[in-house]
């Protein structure tokens, strides 16, 4: 009896010690419930049959739906057609600076959409450097989508090419297959899951994009996200906005589910001996040159245009000395830091819970399926008393940022050998000790990469800030938009100077991201 009582006391003690840990692991689920699911349910209650009927019977709304879908499809197709040849050239051909090109493909991932939009306006807008005939046409938005998403497709195709075993290519070459035949028969089938995942991600970004469409769409080529913002901010038409939000969510949900399913397949990659880069032939050198020029024109030229316009801004550089600019910079850094603390907690606990429960993995992509405009609109409806609350803004920032941490940490966690934790447990280490002294040190590089990408997301966040921010909470992105939307050459030049500042912040984050990768490589060596 005495032994049974002791056993019961031990089990009760274990349960009591595990209870706080279990509640901590539930934090991301409770957060998603409060910040995503409940606001979406509130939005659903705002709509009715009449509002749906009004939207479908409105010719303007139908054209808006058609254009939003069409521009996402065209952008996905363009990035696929351009990205695959570029990825093949970068993967298969040896050239000077190849490693730097692979690194620079990460740059648009950390570059705010507002910087991309302003850069394209600097090239082809009303005061464009190269051409001024694109204003009021769809080409500005399509070019912006290609700029922002071409690296996504190139990296997806590159990862697929890295999974093609060299033995298959050598065997095909032995059988007389040329470069084109090897690509069609061997490489392309192997790449398809990665390409499909890249297309889904590009479609998601383009369909639910806000910043680029607001800056580059003009009056005739705005998208659903911009229309939702205008309905709420200027017309207070919650019913029609709710219908458009639900349509957006339904579309992005389907694309997100497909992407999540493909990610499960692409995550199960094995170590293969890939074909080493070859010295290009004369014809391949021409193709390589075209690929590099394409990357330069699509991904680097708008950033150079921002720098050039800022250099010529003259007295507009005095905007850096104004108190409004310093307040916006301080708010940007302050909100980012606050969101990073919450995002790090959410990202790590979500990854830890996903290690125990397989279905939690699919929730990693839930914030990607819900655009910032939809999240902000839902929060305004669900929590009207917190409309002017800083905590709501920080929670929105964290929601958009923490999936980057979860994704990197979860991938690194999956690759850890189980023997490490088993050996530590055999030596008498508790679960907490295993976590602190074995798992966390091994996951630190992945956490650093995730935090860098998450911080870049917060620094350049625009849509949620425009919805939820108060005048005294102005950030760099909203201040840039204020100057762009105000007439006058001086305001335009001020916007360029501040955009350069925002771009330099993003590049600093990019440098920190690359530093963490180099540190990881050195630790492995």
Describe the predicted segments one by one.
Residues 9-42, 99-105, 249-256, 277-305, ...:
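N-terminal signal-anchor/first transmembrane alpha helix
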Residues 10-22, 41-77, 92-93, 184-185, ...:
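Periplasmic/extracellular loop-to-transmembrane helix junction in inner-membrane transport proteins
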Residues 18, 52-54, 59, 207, ...:
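Interhelical loop and adjacent transmembrane-helix boundary motif
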């Amino acid at each position: 009896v005495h032994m049974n009582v002791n056993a019961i006391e031990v089990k009760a003690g274990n349960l009591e010690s595990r209870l706080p840990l279990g509640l901590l692991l539930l934090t991301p689920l409770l957060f998603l419930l409060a910040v995503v699911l409940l606001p979406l349910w509130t939005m659903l209650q705002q709509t009715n049959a009449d509002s749906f009927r009004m939207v479908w019977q409105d010719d303007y709304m139908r054209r808006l739906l058609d254009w939003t879908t069409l521009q996402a499809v065209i952008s996905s197709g363009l990035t696929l057609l351009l990205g695959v040849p570029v990825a093949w050239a970068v993967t298969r051909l040896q050239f000077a600076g190849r490693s730097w090109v692979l690194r620079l493909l990460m740059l648009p991932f950390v570059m705010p959409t507002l910087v991309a939009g302003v850069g394209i306006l600097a090239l082809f807008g009303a005061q464009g450097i190269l051409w001024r005939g694109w204003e009021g046409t769809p080409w500005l938005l399509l070019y912006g989508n290609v700029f922002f998403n071409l690296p996504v497709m190139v990296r997806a195709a590159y990862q697929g090419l890295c999974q093609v075993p060299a033995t298959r290519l050598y065997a095909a070459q032995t059988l007389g297959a040329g470069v084109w035949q090897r690509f069609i028969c061997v490489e392309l089938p192997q790449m398809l899951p990665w390409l499909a995942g890249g297309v889904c991600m590009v479609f998601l970004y383009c369909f639910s994009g806000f910043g680029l469409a607001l800056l580059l769409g003009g009056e005739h080529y705005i998208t659903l996200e911009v229309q939702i913002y205008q309905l709420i901010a200027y017309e207070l038409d919650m019913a029609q906005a709710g219908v458009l939000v639900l349509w957006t969510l339904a579309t992005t949900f389907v694309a997100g589910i497909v992407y999540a399913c493909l990610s499960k397949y692409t995550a199960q990659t094995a170590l293969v001996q890939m074909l080493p880069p070859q010295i290009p032939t004369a014809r391949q050198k021409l193709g390589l040159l075209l690929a590099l020029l394409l990357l330069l024109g699509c991904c680097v030229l708008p950033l150079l245009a921002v720098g050039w316009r800022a250099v010529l801004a003259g007295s507009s550089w005095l905007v850096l000395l104004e108190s409004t600019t310093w307040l916006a910079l301080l708010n940007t850094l302050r909100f980012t830091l606050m969101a990073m603390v919450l995002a790090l907690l959410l990202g790590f606990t979500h990854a830890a819970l996903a290690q125990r429960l397989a279905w939690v993995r699919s929730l990693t992509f839930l914030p990607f399926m819900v655009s910032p405009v939809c999240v902000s609109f839902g929060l305004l409806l669900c929590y009207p008393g917190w409309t002017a609350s800083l905590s709501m803004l920080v929670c929105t920032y964290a929601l958009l940022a923490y999936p980057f941490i979860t994704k990197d940490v979860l991938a690194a966690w999956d690759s850890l050998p189980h023997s490490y934790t088993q050996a530590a447990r055999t030596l008498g280490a508790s679960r907490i000790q295993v976590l602190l002294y074995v798992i966390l040190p091994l996951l630190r590089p992945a956490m650093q990469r995730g935090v860098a990408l998450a911080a870049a997301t917060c620094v350049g966040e625009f849509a949620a800030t425009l919805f939820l921010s108060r005048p005294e909470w102005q950030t760099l992105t909203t201040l840039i938009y204020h100057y762009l939307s105000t007439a006058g050459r001086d305001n335009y030049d001020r916007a360029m100077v501040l955009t350069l500042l925002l771009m330099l912040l993003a590049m600093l984050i990019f440098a920190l991201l690359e530093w963490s990768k180099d540190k990881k490589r050195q630790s492995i060596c």
